[in-house]
């Protein structure tokens, strides 16, 4: 049984539509293998080369002044594409983030770079609407439904929101216990012991059986992200 690598992703932007000149100002992506966070993540604030509208600032609290010395998207594009590799992207309201990411990639004007395909992304907003018709589907609402602690989320933040979405996604797909049962079964089938993920070998990931220590690190990683973001 092979391991399932997924990337939980979120972005913050200067506005609602890249066609209006809006850009990405923050990317947060977290690696999850068999529904367990590995601790590997990709996070950058980005200089959008434009002003920050007040409407956007009210949502995420990221100012134009703060972003002045941050890298441009083209300087981190290759690292971003290497991090997500061919893994499934898990996004809340995927069309929004994919639209902005593809706009940024298209600005690079590099033929070898393939744009992201929306149909290959897992949209947790669509999942929630299907599972709970008539309910509220915001990330905050889903955190409340699944008792995910989002008390530190006064403002939006890409890495912080990706960490919360990771917990919500696990619940949407059967819950933590379901994920652990899958890992135990995989470990028995393959007779493999736990191996730490190597940042240079994420394309060939070993099956992971989570230990008590790893589960504690999983919780500590989420706590650290929510406090720092």
UniProtKB/Swiss-Prot annotation:
Annotated binding of a divalent metal cation 2, by residue: 10
Record keywords, A-Z: DNA replication, DNA-directed DNA polymerase, Exonuclease, Hydrolase, Magnesium, Manganese, Metal-binding, Nuclease, Nucleotidyltransferase, Transferase
Cofactor binding note from Swiss-Prot or TrEMBL: Binds 2 divalent metal cations. Magnesium or manganese.
Enzyme class: transferase
Catalytic residues (positions): 156
Catalytic activity: DNA(n) + a 2'-deoxyribonucleoside 5'-triphosphate = DNA(n+1) + diphosphate
TM segment ranges: none
EC number: 2.7.7.7
GO molecular function terms noted in the UniProt entry: 3'-5' exonuclease activity; DNA binding; DNA-directed DNA polymerase activity; metal ion binding
Residue numbers binding a divalent metal cation 1: 10, 12, 161
One Gene Ontology cellular component: cytosol
Annotated substrate binding sites: 10, 12, 55, 60, 161
Cofactor: Mg(2+); Mn(2+)
Pfam family, one: RNase_T
Keyword Transferase: yes
Alphabetized Gene3D superfamilies for the sequence: Ribonuclease H-like superfamily/Ribonuclease H
GO biological process: DNA replication proofreading
Subunit note: DNA polymerase III contains a core (composed of alpha, epsilon and theta chains) that associates with a tau subunit. This core dimerizes to form the POLIII' complex. PolIII' associates with the gamma complex (composed of gamma, delta, delta', psi and chi chains) and with the beta chain to form the complete DNA polymerase III complex.
Function as written in the Swiss-Prot or TrEMBL entry: DNA polymerase III is a complex, multichain enzyme responsible for most of the replicative synthesis in bacteria. The epsilon subunit contain the editing function and is a proofreading 3'-5' exonuclease.
Alphabetized PANTHER family for the sequence: DNA POLYMERASE III SUBUNIT EPSILON (PTHR30231:SF41)
Identification of the protein by name: DNA polymerase III subunit epsilon
Organism: Rickettsia bellii (strain RML369-C)
Gene designation: dnaQ
